[in-house]
Amino acid sequence: MAFAVIRACSRVGRGGLYKRLGGPPRGTRRQRQRPRQGRQGASRSIAEQRSAAPRPPTGPPARYPSPAASARASEARRHPAADLDPPPGEPQAVASRGTPEPRPPPESPGAPPPPGSAPADGAMAAAKPGELMGICSSYQAVMPHFVCLTDEFPQPVRPAKLPKGKGRLRRPRQSRFKTQPVTFDEIQEVEEEGVSPMEEEKAKKSFLQSLECLRRSTQSLSLQREPLGSCKLRNSLDSSDSDSAL
């Protein structure tokens, strides 16, 4: 290790590979302090050191390559054609040599298929259902519109809506008697059957109650109208009095 460091220092020099020497090199003070007799030898040694040391580059400073780029470059030096991905039909040896193998011409639609393609197609057709099932299960969350999902996961059917209007069942007569108008058939039916004394008493009582409610409502309305009329009359009298007083 020490020999390697000494050898590198002798090649590069004390100043370094890319370090510019701005002033005089080190050790000049000691050389100045020496007698004049040794100045000539010192100047010669300095000149030799300057001539031996490599000059720094005058251009822009060199950029150190990234570790990823250096790794790629080393791999490319080891394998010159390693970055060339071989096509699926070509062997690995041809791709490593870098000479592409001549491909066969495209087949015409009417040409008969090669003999080895029929069993391969049959094997692929036999392996398709399982592969499709696996594809459907793996793409269930990614591609919900996939074709297989319609068979495996059918969509729920909406319940049929209840019919409206004429199609609905009519309520019984007792519950709809007060809300819907009575038909002539129902009146005739009641007249034919006759009315029991209990029902007649109930009808009379309900009729009297309705009359009493009507009387009370009219009385309250008349009582409310009287103060309103008096207020209007008073206002008119006040206005007339004020006019007459003027």
Swiss-Prot record:
Keywords: Cytoplasm, Phosphoprotein. The modification Phosphothreonine is found at T179. It is found in: Cytoplasm. Residues 9-125, 155-203 are annotated as: Disordered. InterPro entries: DUF4695. The keyword Iron-sulfur does not apply. This is Uncharacterized protein C11orf96 homolog. Residues 54-64, 101-117 have a biased composition (Pro residues). It comes from the Eukaryota. Residues 27-37, 161-176 have a biased composition (Basic residues). Its main location: cytoplasm. It comes from Mus musculus. The modification Phosphoserine is found at S196, S210, S220.
